[in-house]
Amino acid sequence: MLSAQQFLKEFNNVESLNESLYEIVSHICEEVKLQGDKALKNYNLQFDQVETEKLELEQSQLKNAYDMLDNETRDALEQSYQRIKVYQENIKVKQESSQQTECYERYHPIERVGIYVPGGKASYPSTVLMTATLAQVAGVNEITVVTPPQNNGICQEVLAACYITGVHHVYQVGGAQSIAALTYGTETIKKVDKIVGPGNQYVAYAKKFVFGQVGIDQIAGPTEIALIIDESADLDAIAYDVFAQAEHDEMACTYVISENEKVLNQLNTIIQEKLQYVERQDIISQSIANHHYLILAQDTEEACLIMNTIAPEHASIQTRAPEMYIDKVKYVGALFLGHFSPEVIGDYMAGPSHVLPTNQTARFTNGLSVNDFMTRHSVIHLSQKTFNEVAESAEHIAHIESLFNHEKSIHVRR
């Protein structure tokens, strides 16, 4: 257990992503740029031990995967899809009327989007739902999914989710090489305008490498959750909230903050007891050993200071009055309030996307939404009357900046 001061000192010294991977990733990206499909197939064999004659899956394979789902799985995926769709439709930015003003904004869906769906330690149909649904609601013309190849084929639930969300292309390629393919294009894969979706450090650095040549959502680090709890919290439930993050990967970070030292000690005992029997113990135990923090705050203000400093991907408030934290907890990817809003519900069913900022980036950026799949530009259509009202001042500013042709462009219209 750490005091707030001890934690903040230690936290500020935590290193970010492993920069040594950057050289490896840049080499992979350059190889894909030069060799196209050949490089992708070679990397599939080298990294995933899968030989792929054909990179793209047929649309019929997506439909077959959907048709083969058992009723319970189909209903769960469909319910998730519908909740996400309705929420994103509600927050989708509305076009302004050009009749109301001489200056306004117009929004258009991005033409082509690439979505990275992790394979690795688990398969994630939820990631398809939490990204492709947003692109679909935005009106994206061409939605492409890339996901690592598997010896026994791509996860059928992932393919079914692609079918539900209207994904146009699915390619069995993962890692940094898939990000390069989406950026530069290959003989088989069309280049896209924007890449979204979570992945490992190789994927994160590939996105960093290609940024500027293609749009990206974020450079994501390992998943993380920070919880503020008090004596009213169900500590068994809190333990599983911690395990739920830790089971993603050994680098997952979990933070529990409380003003009550006894509560933190009780939680620690419960976690250690359950850890002996928990599923995915190998991953969880490493995460808990290296990236799990119990933090004692002096008061609510200090608890919120810690939370806002961590700026976690997921913030959970499980106290007697969680609503009091809404305005105090500012810099988080998503805020989950109360016992019946566990972070895991946000992973699957709540409606907002689970693609969220990590690594303190919630201090300046946001979780993925339908509006991230749209471009925005200003429209300026002035009347002669308005032009005449502003021209003299604009001309003067151009003059003091010594941009004389700017000045003349205005002057000749007066």
UniProtKB/Swiss-Prot annotation:
This is Histidinol dehydrogenase. It is an enzyme of class 1 (oxidoreductase). It comes from Staphylococcus epidermidis (strain ATCC 12228 / FDA PCI 1200). The keyword Magnesium does not apply. PROSITE patterns: HISOL_DEHYDROGENASE. Keywords: Amino-acid biosynthesis, Histidine biosynthesis, Metal-binding, NAD, Oxidoreductase, Zinc. The active site is at E313, H314. It comes from the Bacteria. Catalyzes the sequential NAD-dependent oxidations of L-histidinol to L-histidinaldehyde and then to L-histidine. Its EC number is 1.1.1.23. The gene is hisD. Gene3D superfamilies: 1.20.5.1300, Nitrogenase molybdenum iron protein domain. It catalyses: L-histidinol + 2 NAD(+) + H2O = L-histidine + 2 NADH + 3 H(+).
